Amino acid sequence: MATPGYDYDRDIPAGFYDEIHQCKAGVRFFWHDLKFRAVAKRLDGVGKVLDVGCGPGTFIGNYLGGVECLGIDFSASQIDYANRRYGTAEHRFSTQMLASLGERFDAITMIELLEHLPPADARRLLAEARGLLSPQGRLVVTTPNYRSLWPLIEWGVNRVSRVSYEQQHINKYWRGRLAADLAQAGYAKVEVGTAVGLAPFAAVFGRGPAQWLDAVERSVGHLGCGNLLVAVARP
């Protein structure tokens, strides 16, 4: 399941997003850091996590210490990178497909994945993941919120970045549509919120301003208009 006409192994080098994270500063770092923190917060207390579309392993390696994790991705080069940098007995990375795992998980994450898939493939993936959750498990999904400032941000990124979201993002969600797809996939309890407002852009002035603005935005729940949707769904 890949974006038609887009070659991830060719256009996104192994470790590309992890190298952004290693900088620990700047707009792009804070964007991904706030996103990962929003997901990790929703995994509090879980015992075993599957990260679908894990890329170079940044989320597992930096935010899920002490948690048994498996990260999977179709890109062999990204998985090779993840194993070299973050692989341990506790943190495993593989190119296995969902159907071949044969394991149950307390939580499954899909971080910035669904927007890259054709709608039918995305719905099928959500349904397959439900079958791998433990009875009390949870699925945590993030995807851009196309009823926020995200379309404007995406337009700008497409003109200054080596990565073209115009080519990558073929499946566009808003709160109601994501909730509907999760319900259609068989999830009984679905909550969709938002995260990541304008705080990352304050990072041009330093870490302090970005952290301050993030605290303000979180205190008002991003007014429901954060640039990312964050859904928690239970089987």
What spans do the regions from the language model cover?
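A C-terminal cap/extension of S-adenosyl-L-methionine-dependent methyltransferases
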Residues: 29, 154-158, 180, 190-235
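Conserved class I S-adenosyl-L-methionine
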Residues: 140-160
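Acceptor-substrate binding/catalytic loop of class I
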Residues: 161-177
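Conserved N-terminal segment of class I S-adenosyl-L-methionine
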Residues: 1-103, 107-111, 120-126, 195-197, ...
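A short glycine-rich, Lys/Arg-flanked "PGG" loop and its adjoining helix->strand segment in the class I
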Residues: 123-135
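A short His-aromatic
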Residues: 115-117
